[in-house]
């Protein structure tokens, strides 16, 4: 009689007990976790788009202020040049004489109209005061008649704040939203086509070939 083999470790058995609720939640929660991951991804993409738009807005504002500053400087230069041109009454070009050993250039200074600078005329002090009063009154009237001129601001472009990064993020967001709302194509159309062909009595070429093959086999 052979000895019966004793099973090893009978006293040290381990039992694994699962929590039924957690087990059921894990097994049935694949779709739920997938939707949660998709939701977090969409929120992250939206956050990145907002940050990129804010960055682009700040860059556009800096460019706009730079353009405004350049325009104001250009307008100031033009006004100064216009004032100088009004004061100058005659202009002469410089003449250059070539000599074998020397080069001589002769330039003449343009005559200025000193009446624009308001030089006080020669005369009595009373006449000067009266003329100054008349000039002040004329200036006040001219200031009232002149409309208030303001520096024309550069127009802002109506284009949206878009960049390559924003375009790529919006494309991925659009793709994810389409995946979420998209449904699998149903086979109802195919079934409808089959039923309509049966009801009408028409058969396709492949169906006719199958039928002729079956009849030939039966005859053989």
From Swiss-Prot:
Sequence similarity: Belongs to the RRP17 family.
GO cellular component: nucleolus
Region spans: Disordered: 109-220
Biological role: May bind to rRNA.
Keywords per UniProt: Coiled coil, Nucleus, RNA-binding, rRNA-binding
Pfam families in alphabetical order: Nop25 (PF09805)
Cellular localization per UniProt: Nucleus, Nucleolus
Keyword rRNA-binding: yes
Coiled-coil positions: 31-86
Lineage: Eukaryota, Metazoa, Chordata, Craniata, Vertebrata
InterPro entries: Nucleolar_protein_12 (IPR019186)
Main location: nucleus
Superkingdom in the source lineage: Eukaryota
Name of protein: Nucleolar protein 12
Biased composition (Basic and acidic residues): 139-148
Molecular-function GO terms, alphabetical: rRNA binding
Segments of skewed composition (Basic residues): 176-186, 205-220
């Amino acid at each position: 009689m052979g000895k019966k083999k004793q099973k090893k470790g009978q006293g040290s058995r381990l039992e694994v007990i699962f929590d039924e609720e957690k087990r059921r939640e894990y097994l049935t929660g694949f779709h739920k976790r997938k939707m949660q991951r998709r939701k977090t991804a969409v929120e992250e993409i939206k956050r990145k788009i907002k940050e990129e738009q804010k960055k682009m807005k700040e860059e556009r504002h800096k460019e706009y202020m730079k353009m405004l500053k350049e325009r104001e400087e250009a307008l100031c230069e033009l006004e100064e040049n216009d004032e100088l041109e009004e004061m100058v009454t005659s202009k002469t070009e410089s003449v250059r004489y070539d000599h074998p050993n020397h080069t001589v250039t002769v330039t003449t200074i343009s005559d200025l109209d000193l009446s624009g600078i308001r030089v006080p005329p020669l005369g009595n002090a009373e006449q000067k005061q009266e003329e100054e009063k008349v000039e002040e009154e004329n200036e006040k009237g001219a200031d009232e008649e002149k409309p208030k001129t303001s520096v024309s601001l550069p127009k802002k472009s109506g284009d949206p704040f878009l960049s390559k990064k924003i375009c790529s993020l919006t494309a991925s967001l659009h793709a994810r939203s389409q995946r979420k709302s998209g449904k699998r194509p149903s086979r109802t159309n195919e079934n409808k086509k089959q039923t309509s062909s049966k009801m009408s009595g028409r058969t396709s070429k492949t169906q006719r070939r199958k039928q002729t093959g079956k009849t030939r086999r039966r005859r053989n």
